[in-house]
Regions:
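Histidine-centered, transition-metal-coordinating active-site segments
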Residues: 1-9, 15-30, 61-205
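Short active-site segment of divalent metal-dependent hydrolases/proteases
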Residues: 42-46, 116
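Alpha-helical ligand/cofactor-binding cores
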Residues: 32, 37, 51-53, 69
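Short alpha-helix carrying the canonical HExxH Zn2+-binding catalytic motif
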Residues: 33-38, 42, 111
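A glycine- and small-aliphatic-rich helix-loop capping segment at beta-alpha/alpha-beta transitions
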Residues: 47-59
Length: 205
């Protein structure tokens, strides 16, 4: 079957979404794209599993968002770093769940990252053969939709409609709650996916 998705897939599918918010809400599309391009540069092989492993091994801990900043400030261009604006670096650093970006463009990337992860995890679960669309509880699908396309359209449209004229990017309460609960549901599925990946690597080796 098709391989499970990686961080490049995450960018290719998530970035166009956050640019949709930017265009619809008259934000800075270039700033949004720059943050989206840089936000996961510091991610490890094997995604968050690799991040957790490095965090347990490094004396001062490891977080991919801090590593992304290190990449753009100190490692790129043979150690010279990139001449990025404060707004871009702020968006990269604060795209994490507990972060609070200072710009609406940064918030757009942060929201897109959450939405992309949910749909990627569902797609990976289906590809791995441990999940079907019909397995997703109706309390989530009734609000968000029954396919990746429907979920994306619902969440993107909801963000745009509820953020017009506001100094924030927000969701309606029903959509926000359904998305949050679906993330929790998919967390359990992701545990099974990680176990499957480990078994496949052992078979290859």
């Amino acid at each position: 079957g098709r391989p499970l998705q990686n961080k490049t897939d995450s960018y290719l599918r998530g970035c166009p979404d956050c640019k949709k918010y930017s265009k619809a809400l008259n934000l800075n599309e270039d700033l949004t794209e720059a943050i989206a391009l840089g936000h996961d540069l510091g991610h490890t092989p094997f995604g968050h599993a690799g991040e957790r492993t490095l965090n347990s091994l490094c004396p001062m801990g490891f977080a991919h968002y801090r590593q992304s900043i290190r990449v753009v400030e100190f490692l790129e261009k043979d150690g010279q770093g990139l001449n990025l604006t404060w707004e871009v670096r702020d968006g990269i650093l604060n795209h994490r769940t507990s972060g609070n970006p200072s710009t609406l463009e940064g918030k757009a990337v942060r929201l897109s990252d959450k939405i992309a992860y949910i749909n990627h995890d569902i797609d990976d679960g289906i590809r791995a053969g441990i999940l079907k669309e019909s397995d997703i509880p109706s309390e989530y699908t009734d609000v968000l939709g029954n396919s990746t396309k429907e979920r994306l359209n619902t969440m993107i449209s909801d963000i745009i409609m509820n953020s017009i004229g506001k100094n924030d990017l927000v969701m309606s309460e029903p959509v926000r709650k359904a998305m949050t609960e679906l993330r929790k549901f998919m967390f359990e599925v992701c545990i099974l996916i990680r176990q499957l990946k480990v078994r496949k690597r052992k078979q290859i080796s």
